[in-house]
Amino acid sequence: MTDIKKSEPAEDYPPEEGCYLRGNDYSPVAVVVILRWRREQTPADIENLVRVGVESGAALAGTLQTENIGIEKIICNVVSNPNIRYLVVCGPESPGHLVGDTLLALAKNGIDDRKRIVGTDAPTPFLFNVQPEFVKRFRDQITVIDLINEGSPEVLRQAVWSCYQEKPTLFGKYEFYDSGAYPAEPLSGKITWKITQPSLEPKSDEERAHRENIQTLIGRIRKAAEKREHSN
């Protein structure tokens, strides 16, 4: 039997709360089910996909709504468990947030110097609240399995099963096997919450400079008003 090396997750694993279920900590796969509805309107078939993910052997399985803070939470939870080497993304794509497309782009391209995920058409794909080290580890540690717009429990079950086989196993266009834990200590930490509304942040250097100029002008006006008030 092949010796597959496993390691202990961080003590606070999984550090971020969310709408997910926890399964086998030593499993090499986690499942993300795209949620395009309001949380309180989650359809039964989406909830079932989450359950199927964990029941099939995933370490974590849960829903994802947003292309920024939601992904930041996933990053923190994944890098705190080196055993997770695959991330299955399934369910109908969100036409607004494009969270599935954003996860694929993150894995392929990373982020730019403004912390924007490169190569996605999502409206606000910014990772302001996680360290660049966490983003790099996430990309190095996991392979994203694209099952976007796939809602079959049987297909998801087969994908998860394929990920924890000892020998390379074909699944569609992919070939999976459990290669063991990522060869580094887990990274432990939560998102900083420095920016809670990424959609309100400047989208370019020009927009940021314009806002800074406005703030400077407002500051000057306030100082002038205070000076006039004290002189009266």
Sequence positions of predicted segments:
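Conserved mixed alpha/beta catalytic, RNA-binding, or beta-rich assembly cores of soluble enzyme
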Residues: 3-118, 196-201, 205-232
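Divalent-metal-activated hydrolytic enzyme cores
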Residues: 110-194
